[in-house]
Design a protein with these regions (language model features):
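Alpha-helical interface subdomain recognition
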Residues: 1-80, 114, 118, 250-415
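N-terminal glycine-rich flavin-associated loop
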Residues: 86-106
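FAD-binding glycine-rich core of flavoenzymes that anchor FAD
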Residues: 102-122
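A generic local secondary-structure boundary/capping motif
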Residues: 111-113, 135-145, 153-155, 169-173, ...
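A generic structural signal for well-ordered coil/turn residues at beta-strand boundaries
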Residues: 120, 150-152, 159, 177-179, ...
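A short core secondary-structure module
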Residues: 125, 168-207
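Intrinsically disordered, low-complexity terminal tails and inter-domain linkers enriched
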Residues: 128-160, 188-189, 318-333, 405-411
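Flexible, small-/acidic-enriched active-site or ligand-binding loops
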Residues: 135-143, 171-174, 201-236
């Protein structure tokens, strides 16, 4: 891994930071989350048309920019700094990569250019509030999670050659406003059951979408009800859905880690700015050793999380771009570290946001102050994509850290 950024990568960061400083300040953010869509359409158009963010990591042949996961992670790190509400995560990180990975050529040619331009937004609908499981981050994504068990789920069946979906999914990121839903559904009955992905278009008969109240208002979520809705199978029935979801999940975890690092970094910056100005006992409270040590610990944690996020993005991008990475020795050999990076980044964000609230004193606990927005982002993301101990536990399980040899000793593991 080359830790140096190219001039193009630095330009992406600089341009996006300048735009978000102008267009997504605290007042803009609070106004955007109150709109029906949950984000500012004008800002989304600027991100899509001027900067090409939705298509940043999509191939040029489908209207994308042709960059790697690293560029997408850097862009999301900047959006995380401002907590910018937008369909970028749902569209560019979850929806479009699945269409690219599993879609038939006709589906790719129709949908990816529209997704890359920002004209069309997408959302991944997973039943049972098990998004992290479906993405292979905290458990077996080859299991029967789409069926939902007693909690319901989404069932798919063919009627006269047409796929129809029944069921519901909750906590769907941007599900209330997306023009395209990628729905995970259970099909084939219990003897031959499997999970496939289906495309549901906006305005389909029987589709009911309701925006839910969420802990983090900058991450709008929805409940999706499918009442005999006509759907289109994504790809074919032999598609490796579990493998595609796990691949997208690792990439998404790396990007989310970078976004969390951006939020943590900005929360720390704001706190440092405040303790330099706030005076007590005739001097700035930032001059007190106890305050310095707390902020120094946060700084170390944020920088460590940043390194982990960058490495995870590089690893995900290398494996996605080079099919022969293992054979040539130029890639990571199929190494998936996104979940570990996300766990470290979420911890750093939670620590930075929590210390920010405490060191701001009474004002940090008020609704009018922005400190709670960062804490809600940390808690909301951990609820959706974690929790942290499960991210680490599953990574240890995959790496076989707890396996023993025949003599009872631990298996040798390369980390």
């Amino acid at each position: 891994m080359d830790a140096r950024f190219t001039a193009e990568q630095e330009e992406i960061r600089r341009t996006l930071r300048e735009l978000l400083l102008k267009r997504c300040g605290p007042e803009d953010l609070r106004a955007a989350v109150l709109t029906p869509a949950g984000y500012d359409p004008a800002l989304w158009e600027a991100l899509a048309r001027q900067l090409g963010l939705p298509g940043l990591a999509l191939p040029e042949v489908y209207g994308g920019v042709g960059c790697s996961v690293t560029e997408l992670a850097l862009a999301c790190e900047e959006s995380g700094r401002s907590l910018a509400p937008s369909p970028l995560l749902a569209t560019a990180v979850l929806g479009a990569p699945l269409v690219l990975a599993l879609g038939a050529e006709a589906q790719r040619a129709e949908l990816l250019p529209r997704l890359a331009s920002g004209e069309l937004t997408a959302a991944l609908a997973v039943p049972g509030a098990v998004l992290a499981t479906a993405l292979g981050l905290v458990g077996d994504n080859g299991g029967d999670w789409a069926g939902g068990g007693r909690a319901g789920g989404v069932q798919a069946r063919q009627v006269d050659g047409v796929w129809r979906l029944y069921g519901q999914a909750a906590q769907v990121l941007d599900g209330h406003s997306a023009g395209l839903l990628v729905v995970a559904a259970h099909t084939g009955g219990f003897a031959r059951s499997r999970t496939l992905l289906y495309l549901v278009r906006d305005g389909s008969a029987g589709l009911v979408r309701v925006r839910q109240t969420s802990l983090d208002e900058t991450r709008p979520q929805a409940r999706i009800e499918l009442r005999d809705v006509e759907a289109e199978l994504l790809g074919d029935e032999d598609a490796d859905v579990a493998g595609a979801l796990a691949g997208v999940g690792d990439m998404a975890a790396a990007v989310l880690a970078a976004e969390a690092v951006g939020a943590a970094d900005r929360a720390l910056e704001r706190t440092v700015e405040y303790v330099r100005q706030r005076e007590q006992f005739g001097r700035a409270i930032g001059s007190f050793q106890a305050v310095k040590h707390r902020l120094a610990d946060v700084y170390v944690e944020v920088q460590a999380a940043r390194s982990a996020a960058y490495y995870a993005a590089w690893a995900a991008g290398t494996d996605a771009a080079t099919a022969t990475a293992t054979a040539t020795g130029t890639g990571t050999g199929g190494e998936r570290v996104g979940g570990l990076a996300l766990a470290q980044a979420l911890e750093a964000l939670r620590r930075a946001a929590g210390e920010g609230i405490q060191l701001h004193g009474g004002i940090g606990f008020t609704w009018e102050h922005d400190a709670h927005l960062y804490f809600k982002r940390a808690a909301g993301d951990e609820s959706l994509f974690g929790p942290v101990h499960r991210l680490r536990g599953y990574a240890a399980e995959v790496a076989r850290l707890f396996d023993r040899k025949g003599d009872g000793s631990r298996a040798e593991v390369t980390v």
